[in-house]
Structure formats: C-alpha cells, structure tokens
Amino acid sequence: MSRESHRRDATAADGGPEASRGEMARYLQRAMDEVAEGRFGSAPPTESGWRRVGRYTRTGERIKDVLDRVLAAMGLLAISPVLLVVAVAIRLDSPGPAFFRQVRIGRNGLPFRFWKFRGMFVDARQRFPELYDYRYDAEQVRQLRFHPPLDPRVTRVGRFIRRTSLDELPNLINVVLGDMSLVGPRPEIPELLPYYGTQARAVLSVKPGITSLAKLLGRDNITFDETLELDLRYVRERSLRMDLGVLFGTVWMVATGRSIGG
C-alpha cells in the first residue's frame, strides 16, 4: 500500500463517520471501474508479498479470528428460529436433506467440510448433465458465470433462499469451527484450483469468508476471472475498515436484492 493511500485512510479517519462512509463508497466504485477496464493485476506482487501488504497485524489476525467466532456463535443462536423454518421448508419442498455439505478449499489450500442449505434437487447432476460432462478450457472457465438465471437443478425454495442469501446462513457453523471468516474470498471447490494462476493462489493465503468484496460488488453476475481479481484486491488491501464496509454493504445488498456494483 502506498504512502498516499495510507494518508487518504488517515484523512478519512479524522473526518468522522461521514468521511469513512465516503471513503468506502469511493473505494468500491474504484474497484468496479478497474474491473470494467481490466486494470487489475497490472503489477502483481509475489505470493509472499500479498501476505505482507494486508493491513492486519498478527495480533489483529488473532483478534479478528476470535471476534469472527464469537459473532458467528451469537448469530447462530439469534437466527435459530429462521434456520428451523428454512430447514422445514426445504424438506417439504423436495426430497432430501435440509443441509448440503461439500468439500471446499480453505486457507493454505486445506480442505474442509462446507455447510449451507440445500437449494438444488438431490439428482442435480441428472437434471443438468452437460454442465458436469463438458470439459471447459482455461479461457472458457475465466469467462464463466456459475449461477445461470434458469437453472433446472434449483428447487422452488432454493431459488428463494439463493436470492435472499438465506442458503449461506449455515456458513456460520464453519466460522465457529474456525474454517472460515465472516469476510474473505468465497471458498473454492477443488475442481477449479487448476484454473487459478500463480498470483491468484494468493487468495488461499487468507481464510475464506461468508461474504466477500466480489460478492458485494458483483453478487453472482460477474465472471470467474473478475471474481479472482476482486478477491486478490481484498487480500492485498484488507483491513478492519474494509471488513466492516463489506459486512454492512452485504446487509444492504440482501435487504435490497441488488449488488453495490449494480
């Protein structure tokens, strides 16, 4: 991070809440502009450099981890009635379990069991076989959008809980277990790791999160490549201010049904 960037951060902090909100809004807009113009990654640092640039200190990382777990545990208790209602709705809507568990890749490339509500039919592979059988080349993967608007695999309740992000609520279990953070790049499936470039693997140097800069700015409407670019920006510039901005922005996104990026 340049001295000028640090100076802007200090100026915003001195300006009070309004300055902080304005700084975050400008940051988010700048991020979207750079994605649109393809200006991300023009001079990427080394993989170890990503670890140095992030503005959390080692002590800050520990505090963040404790806060994540405490807030996630409190959140699970607070929303337990909602979890029960969603689980019952899923079971009544289609055969199969209420929860979906899948292996995802976490910090330092370690696999973990990922929890979310099931939003698809249990025979999803049979309903959309071409998605699983087709062999994409690297360029096709970079341009993929992984949530097609008319997906035959998704149930009626699944469409609702995906649109409202209720399907992600069980991710709080992963935060309590220490596999995930509240904010961070979304955890990847093992099959897509070969498509990550060397620099993009820096995304795995931090814990994956329930929400992310990419989810906030693009929700499900940006490509695999654009998601990676935003994840890399988060790894490079993450801080308490950014995490709070992403959290509050996510609440706004869920409430309005729109991403910050439009």
Predicted stretch roles:
Residues 40, 99-152, 211-229:
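Short, glycine-rich, amphipathic interfacial segments at transmembrane boundaries or analogous
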Residues 43-45, 169-176, 216-219:
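Hydrophobic alpha-helical segments characteristic of transmembrane helices
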Residues 55-127, 240, 245-262:
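A hydrophobic, helix-centered structural microdomain
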Residues 56, 60-64, 147-151, 162-166, ...:
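Short, solvent-exposed loop/helix junctions and linker helices
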Residues 1-79, 201, 234-236, 260-262:
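N-terminal hydrophobic signal-anchor/signal peptide
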Residues 190-208, 213-215, 219-246, 254, ...:
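Cytosol-/stroma-facing membrane-proximal "stalk/adaptor" domains immediately downstream
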